[in-house]
């Protein structure tokens, strides 16, 4: 049986990003034989360094980037970076703005989020998204102490998309990749165990996910990254870490991001 092709989609906005989601839903409905991984959503992006970090990750994931940035400077940065690096990038706003300008001589006000009421929930979401981007992939372990959740797992256990998805729900989430050769940050010992989530995946499934990842990057040679014996070692190590830090463990095998997030939220509700 032929495996369905998968396209990873990054959605970037300086507001909620609802515009791109509506378009994407309409487009994906026309391709029933393609899997669109739409877990990577980055709303409230208003700093150039945040934007460039996301675009660099998009290159690594061979992703399609959809943008509804209304800020012309940020949009130009994204467009120029994408052109220079061969990144598939679709700007949904500025080509339309340009047509209006040519016809009327009027420029847009470039104010993000004018469709949405600026309430407490909105600003909490902004803060949570910025937090997830800042503390993704163990970049700054001191952020663990301010996190609602700390996600732990070996490579390709959905740590980043889960962080972003949960951030869209207002949770401050950081994550740390578990690599046997890399020492764990000491600050992890100070984190409330009930806030630590350990992510597991069946070895064979994880090997397949990693192989697909390498194939998407044009790398077809076998490496330790996809070697089943090495993956067993990584997962055994992660189980030791989970036990040491008393993490709440979730097996993500064959679960969608939404399903895993539901289980995490259910765990949090039981703590109240």
UniProtKB/Swiss-Prot annotation:
Annotated keywords: Kinase, Nucleotide-binding, Serine/threonine-protein kinase, Transferase
EC number(s) given by UniProt: 2.7.11.32, 2.7.4.27
Pfam families tied to this protein: Kinase-PPPase
Residues holding ADP: 153-160
MF term (GO), any: protein serine/threonine kinase activity
Reactions catalysed, as given in the entry: N(tele)-phospho-L-histidyl/L-threonyl-[pyruvate, phosphate dikinase] + ADP = N(tele)-phospho-L-histidyl/O-phospho-L-threonyl-[pyruvate, phosphate dikinase] + AMP + H(+); N(tele)-phospho-L-histidyl/O-phospho-L-threonyl-[pyruvate, phosphate dikinase] + phosphate + H(+) = N(tele)-phospho-L-histidyl/L-threonyl-[pyruvate, phosphate dikinase] + diphosphate
Functional description taken from the UniProt entry: Bifunctional serine/threonine kinase and phosphorylase involved in the regulation of the pyruvate, phosphate dikinase (PPDK) by catalyzing its phosphorylation/dephosphorylation.
Family to which this protein belongs: Belongs to the pyruvate, phosphate/water dikinase regulatory protein family. PDRP subfamily.
Name of protein: Putative pyruvate, phosphate dikinase regulatory protein
Species assigned in the record: Streptococcus sanguinis (strain SK36)
